[in-house]
């Protein structure tokens, strides 16, 4: 006589057969075969951000990731995510969906990529958890394009949770090392997507503004034969039967282009610094936005051009990237970035006076420390209501050998830094374009002339007066958004302790 369990199993098998026979939607869901460019169907995929009430009652196809899923009775709610936008989708038993299809949808692993056909429906009550709050997608077909593994190294909801919320209610947040160790997942968050879309906008606006001003974009070598600028903080690489170095800066080549009569040049490219600095704002590799420009009579012509370029970038970001700014602010609240037109320019001696009035003891020829930079930023904000300003006329003693001395005050120089929220984002100067004076200044700094011979020689055939500077892209992004670590704005950051991924 068969056991009760055996009898039960015998009863279940016919039930499975019956369920399969009753699965009238079996052609409407499943796992697609791997896309190997076998065909090109006549199907238009709609972007999630375009799912608005204007598309109500339309049948659309969408490809997105499964952000979350929640089964409830005979229906399943999915949140479908595409970059920084998401929409709610509903799979419910009915004419187009069987209970097997609902179960299939509920069991799709998070982060899997799916194709969905559905009807856009206007909702009566806004869906606060989604960017597309006024509509949802009523699913008719659902196919898995790429299945994610069931165990994720981090949960995206945890990764976008503000730290304050995590501290208050004990919910999980994700620390920086975990994020960077699993950067591919971390970059999928709405915050990361917004950061790097905005960063792309900075590059675009930088290029657009300078081309409109008559600048020429150049490309400079990153593998060089000698330590650029005579500096020591360089990476050495094997170069066939000798050694070469990774460029600390494109400055030499920018200046050579000025000597070659290009007059106004800029470049966007990697910069390498072998500095063992484990701070919130230093990287060993970052993207430099570099400018060099010949001027007629005064280096302030260049200062004004660079400052205006940055102002145009700030304005462009505020006009074109409000969605991204608001997305980042949800996780990292910050006051809007403020700037003046024309840009505030203070002399170094004025900054010293403000700091001394605030109780800081500093010598006239002492450089600003990071804490004093931040304090000065707060003082400037209080007095002038701006987060962006130029500090001019630095002491000659704290600037590189190629910096032009101030002809009226031998202790000062024709050099400047630009600041955002109390942190330096650009360092620049009028360059010495006379080979004799350049040689004297190099000797004064104890630099081996043989190592910078090519640099000095580039000015021996007539060089126009010129000035320039270098901007750190990641630092500008960080400070514009009010973030607290440059690793958040470097897609795959490199610092003294990180060489992967």
From Swiss-Prot:
<dbReference type="InterPro" id="IPR004365">
    <property type="entry name" value="NA-bd_OB_tRNA"/>
</dbReference>
<keyword id="KW-0597">Phosphoprotein</keyword>
<dbReference type="InterPro" id="IPR006195">
    <property type="entry name" value="aa-tRNA-synth_II"/>
</dbReference>
<feature type="modified residue" description="Phosphoserine">
    <location>
        <position position="249"/>
    </location>
</feature>
<feature type="binding site">
    <location>
        <begin position="273"/>
        <end position="275"/>
    </location>
    <ligand>
        <name>ATP</name>
    </ligand>
</feature>
<dbReference type="InterPro" id="IPR012340">
    <property type="entry name" value="NA-bd_OB-fold"/>
</dbReference>
<keyword id="KW-0963">Cytoplasm</keyword>
<keyword id="KW-0007">Acetylation</keyword>
<dbReference type="GO" id="GO:0006422">
    <property type="term" value="P:aspartyl-tRNA aminoacylation"/>
</dbReference>
<feature type="binding site">
    <location>
        <position position="229"/>
    </location>
    <ligand>
        <name>L-aspartate</name>
    </ligand>
</feature>
<feature type="modified residue" description="N6-acetyllysine">
    <location>
        <position position="374"/>
    </location>
</feature>
<dbReference type="InterPro" id="IPR004364">
    <property type="entry name" value="Aa-tRNA-synt_II"/>
</dbReference>
<dbReference type="InterPro" id="IPR004523">
    <property type="entry name" value="Asp-tRNA_synthase_2"/>
</dbReference>
<keyword id="KW-0436">Ligase</keyword>
<dbReference type="GO" id="GO:0003723">
    <property type="term" value="F:RNA binding"/>
</dbReference>
<feature type="binding site">
    <location>
        <begin position="281"/>
        <end position="283"/>
    </location>
    <ligand>
        <name>ATP</name>
    </ligand>
</feature>
<keyword id="KW-0067">ATP-binding</keyword>
<dbReference type="GO" id="GO:0017101">
    <property type="term" value="C:aminoacyl-tRNA synthetase multienzyme complex"/>
</dbReference>
<keyword id="KW-0547">Nucleotide-binding</keyword>
<dbReference type="GO" id="GO:0045202">
    <property type="term" value="C:synapse"/>
</dbReference>
<feature type="modified residue" description="Phosphothreonine">
    <location>
        <position position="52"/>
    </location>
</feature>
<feature type="binding site">
    <location>
        <position position="431"/>
    </location>
    <ligand>
        <name>L-aspartate</name>
    </ligand>
</feature>
<dbReference type="Pfam" id="PF01336">
    <property type="entry name" value="tRNA_anti-codon"/>
</dbReference>
<feature type="modified residue" description="N6-acetyllysine">
    <location>
        <position position="74"/>
    </location>
</feature>
<feature type="binding site">
    <location>
        <position position="424"/>
    </location>
    <ligand>
        <name>ATP</name>
    </ligand>
</feature>
<comment type="similarity">
    <text>Belongs to the class-II aminoacyl-tRNA synthetase family. Type 2 subfamily.</text>
</comment>
<keyword id="KW-0648">Protein biosynthesis</keyword>
<dbReference type="GO" id="GO:0005737">
    <property type="term" value="C:cytoplasm"/>
</dbReference>
<feature type="binding site">
    <location>
        <position position="273"/>
    </location>
    <ligand>
        <name>L-aspartate</name>
    </ligand>
</feature>
<comment type="subunit">
    <text>Homodimer. Part of a multisubunit complex that groups tRNA ligases for Arg (RARS1), Asp (DARS1), Gln (QARS1), Ile (IARS1), Leu (LARS1), Lys (KARS1), Met (MARS1) the bifunctional ligase for Glu and Pro (EPRS1) and the auxiliary subunits AIMP1/p43, AIMP2/p38 and EEF1E1/p18.</text>
</comment>
<dbReference type="GO" id="GO:0005829">
    <property type="term" value="C:cytosol"/>
</dbReference>
<keyword id="KW-0030">Aminoacyl-tRNA synthetase</keyword>
<protein>
    <recommendedName>
        <fullName>Aspartate--tRNA ligase, cytoplasmic</fullName>
        <ecNumber>6.1.1.12</ecNumber>
    </recommendedName>
</protein>
<dbReference type="Pfam" id="PF00152">
    <property type="entry name" value="tRNA-synt_2"/>
</dbReference>
<dbReference type="GO" id="GO:0005524">
    <property type="term" value="F:ATP binding"/>
</dbReference>
<feature type="binding site">
    <location>
        <begin position="472"/>
        <end position="475"/>
    </location>
    <ligand>
        <name>ATP</name>
    </ligand>
</feature>
<dbReference type="InterPro" id="IPR002312">
    <property type="entry name" value="Asp/Asn-tRNA-synth_IIb"/>
</dbReference>
<comment type="function">
    <text>Catalyzes the specific attachment of an amino acid to its cognate tRNA in a 2 step reaction: the amino acid (AA) is first activated by ATP to form AA-AMP and then transferred to the acceptor end of the tRNA.</text>
</comment>
<feature type="binding site">
    <location>
        <position position="427"/>
    </location>
    <ligand>
        <name>L-aspartate</name>
    </ligand>
</feature>
<dbReference type="InterPro" id="IPR045864">
    <property type="entry name" value="aa-tRNA-synth_II/BPL/LPL"/>
</dbReference>
<dbReference type="GO" id="GO:0004815">
    <property type="term" value="F:aspartate-tRNA ligase activity"/>
</dbReference>
<feature type="region of interest" description="Aspartate">
    <location>
        <begin position="251"/>
        <end position="254"/>
    </location>
</feature>
